[in-house]
Curated annotation (Swiss-Prot):
It catalyses: tRNA(Cys) + L-cysteine + ATP = L-cysteinyl-tRNA(Cys) + AMP + diphosphate. GO terms for molecular function: ATP binding; cysteine-tRNA ligase activity; zinc ion binding. Belongs to the class-I aminoacyl-tRNA synthetase family. This is Cysteine--tRNA ligase. The lineage of its organism: Bacteria, Pseudomonadati, Campylobacterota, Epsilonproteobacteria, Campylobacterales. It is found in: Cytoplasm. GO terms for cellular component: cytosol. It comes from Sulfurovum sp. (strain NBC37-1). SUPFAM superfamilies: Anticodon-binding domain of a subclass of class I aminoacyl-tRNA synthetases, Nucleotidylyl transferase. Zn(2+) binds at C27, C208, H237, E241. The gene is cysS. ATP binds at K272.
Amino acid sequence: MQIFDSVQKTKVTFEPIREGEASIYVCGPTVYDDAHLGHARSSLAFDLLSRTLKALGYKVIMAKNFTDIDDKIIKKVEETGKSMQEITSYYIQRYLDEMEQLGVQRADIEPKATESLDAIEQMIQTLIDKDFAYVVSNGDVYFDTSKDSHYGDISHKVSDDDTQSRVEHNSEKRNPRDFALWKACKGEEDICFGAPFSSGRPGWHIECSAMIEKYFKGNGQYSIDIHGGGADLLFPHHENEAAQSRCATGHELAKYWMHNGFVQINGEKMSKSLGNSFFLKDALEVYGGEVLRYYLNSVHYRNDFNFNEEDLQTAKKRLDKLYRLKKRVLPGKASTVNKAFKQALLNAMSDDLNISIALAVIDEMIAETNEKLDTDPKNKALKKETIANIEFIDTLLGFGGKEPFSYFQIGVDEALKEKIEILLQERTEAKKAKDFATSDAIRNELIDMGISIMDTAEGTVWEKA
């Protein structure tokens, strides 16, 4: 498999540190608010990576962390009066529920910073003992970037007046680029944890480094195969992670670094300051998880994604075609996936997750199958193979797994659903009474509402026309 390594800035052949296995760590959310589309895109990108590696026969071990100690969380505590655990537990569950709606497979390991404090403190102490970190008078602990000759190798963009120096103010820092490993308590009201250096809390960067060392064994040269996250994390977060781990362990953190592009809303970078931050929960309510998954994955993961209604509707129409084909070949059981079709999809996804080619392969399969069914509508072998093809799409890409009528009900609000069910019940009763005039009138009323119905052995099903 070919993947794009952000450090080498080129596509490389994936060669795992342990034969047949793939270890992946993805930076998860800071859990103080609802997830936005940027969180969704990152999760979907690395879900595709995990699914592809599994389809290629690798045993994948993926970790995605939750940052549940952070200044933003503490601010939320102050604003709401709720405990830190109440806030973080609530938003972690919200995030997991929304990822499930998107079809994102759960990570094998979901570490929290609060559950990794021993590992964090141990790594900080190791860095102090090795003279890569220093404690200042107020109890803060800083990483000394001047001691790491490879600092800057990950992002290739380090300078003395970087973002770090503007964010972390302390006159006792030895270098502007030095960053906090541990932040001492600021007062009695602060949320703090005991440690040998001072009572305080960990810095953001050290949390990920320590959790990786806690849960992954590595091979003595690298701790994990792939470290992933959004492009905005490349510097300073991933640069700092790499430096800490390198100096604490004596080997590199990750063999490969992968990053997904930004999300824009109608051509502007999504951000809370611009007031165009789109919460994932709102998008899920309007479009449903599967349509959103298809759309957010329809652009290559490394490219910036411009979220707009027109492109979303175009993506939905492509997904609709798959479900219309599925409706055409059901009911029935799958046979064996078409070998050429399966290989074409695997070839596309093995080329650094080339989703555009993969979707084109699917579109071609849909068109060719429909053409064959037009000629031979009762071709059972073709129908069984098509069911298998769609099941493989669902396994590899995470869409196509719903029942067609369930899929085509997405976007219908609950009030309208309730009205439809009432009308269908009235129609059933009319048919039992052989009142076909009323039955036909109800069908026509539903058609006028934009709803089509089909009578099956299991009962009447409906969908948006």
